[in-house]
Amino acid sequence: MKYEPVMTPEYNEMVKEKIRRVKEYLGNNGILGTWVPGGPFNNASMIINHSDLYMLFMNDPEYFDLLMQFTTNRTLPYTKAFIEAGADAMLVGGNVPGGFLGADIYEQFILPYEKKYIDFIQEQGCPAVYHNCGQIMSLVGSYKKLGARVVEPFSPIPLGDAILADAVGIVNGDYVIIGGIDQVNVLQKGTLEQVRKSTIEIMEAGKRNGPFIIQSADFLEYNTPLENVEEFISTAMRNAAY
């Protein structure tokens, strides 16, 4: 921890140039969301064995606190560089402290550190998009306390445990929901009719109560048929009106 190199001026300039090029390409056809190395807990999972990490906040809370401070602070300069370079949103990985931990554990031991990082992002005028692609339902209410403007991707069963209609009712418009078409069993392996049916079902569930953005539940799988993606987009556009 003590001797980790700091972000260099050269890295900062490289970020500015890459974001400039991407935004120039995008023009008015989209926004640019950039990833950082996760929230504090996700970041810690890259340097600490997961089995140890999941017990650390109970077995050695003092060290856990130091670790979370370290994984927060090491990310701040990079996060600021992305925002100052023009990123429209910051995507924050939060899948490692997933729903299997339960709301009580998450809120007591994880949420305070994640919230501090989320606050840092949003105090600079950039919305934070919190990402949990695994079990999520037990934490849907907890994420209201997290303060992120957006939460995604609400992976449906069997990829995760999200039931979008239930989640929308819990959130009640307190944050934007992004989700949640099954990118494996529907977009990659499904028929056009299955894509249409699932898209309509997800769209209707999502826009029932509060702001909603439809997308695949996670990144597209390799060899996803282009015609399935086109059908997903066109069906979503036809059914997007509230």
Give residue ranges: language-model regions.
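Active-site loop segments of alpha/beta catalytic cores
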Residues: 1-242
